[in-house]
Amino acid sequence: MPNTLDLHSLIPTIGLSTNATVSPSNGIATDFSNPVTFTVTNNTASAIYTVKVTAIGKPTAVFVSLPASMNELNSEELTACKWMLQNIPNSLYASFTDIKNGTVDLSECKVIWWHYHKDGGVDGKEAFERSAPEAVNAAVALRDYYNNGGSFLFTRYATNMPAEIGAVANNAAPNNCWGQNEADAEKVSGPWNFFIQGHTSHPLFQNLIMKSGEPNSIYTCDANYRITNSTAQWHIGTDWGGYDNLNKWRTETGAQDLAYGGDGAVVAWEFPATGTKGKILCIGSGCYDWYSVDDVPAFYHNNIAKMTQNAFNYLMNH
């Protein structure tokens, strides 16, 4: 938790199954200055959980999003955020309003991650600015962070954000975007993948679970996984979109392509560090998905967490 919060009076929100109760009571101001023990009871069964809250003054990594509290994130975003808090040391959640107002001390922050999901998709720069005004309002503070060496991981529709902080040479955003609703997400019949030919040695793609005989394919989900196919990519081709080929896209945007869809669209890319500026990694592939409505045993889906860990390592240490 940010050290600006009073640990002596935090209000816990605890999810309980039907007929279960918890003591101390849920939703009541509680003193977390020391570890707190909660007892959950359901009929004759009971379990004891100890919660320790750590106050963080200067985070190393921040998951940023639109709501004031991470409890207000949708399921896709919340799953990603919880993973970060559990796996990236000295990390915390902050809202864009927190960033704008300077509530969070970013002086030692190496990476800010925004994973943005919106049911139905976010198609185009104007649609992005309408759907995420809090992010746009924080652009000045984020630009200062970036210009002073701070790095970003932008995933899904957050890949529109580099244009808002002056990172894209032509001020453009992904030109080929769509997505489904979480509640009626598509059930895949087999694993989905994207392609990394020419970039297999990039740190983002190391130590993943690979399919035998397919060194250029990254698989990210398993059969029966429910996926919204939420995509924010760059169409490349002479038919439409303004980027006849990859060289033109690279020259006009200043970005470097890292991964591709089956039609050659750019689905992962980066803006290398230049001068005093930090690095930016973007993943806009519909295959990059954290949450399935139906619980499915994970094999290839473990690549999502591993790839994200790789991203943090790359942005923090290279």
Q: What residues fall within each predicted segment?
A:
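Beta-rich interaction/scaffold domains
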Residues: 1-59
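Conserved beta-strand elements of the Class I
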Residues: 60-62, 281
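Helical hinge/lid and interdomain linker segments adjacent to catalytic or ligand-binding clefts
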Residues: 62, 66, 70-171
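Short, solvent-exposed loop/turn segments at secondary-structure junctions
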Residues: 68-69, 118-119, 159-161, 264-265, ...
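A glycine-rich, often tryptophan-bearing local segment used as a flexible ligand/cofactor-contacting loop or short
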Residues: 124-229
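Catalytic beta-strand/loop cores that center a nucleophilic Ser/Cys/Thr
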Residues: 186-285
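A short acidic/glycine-rich loop-to-helix N-cap element
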Residues: 289-308
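C-terminal alpha-helix
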Residues: 310-318
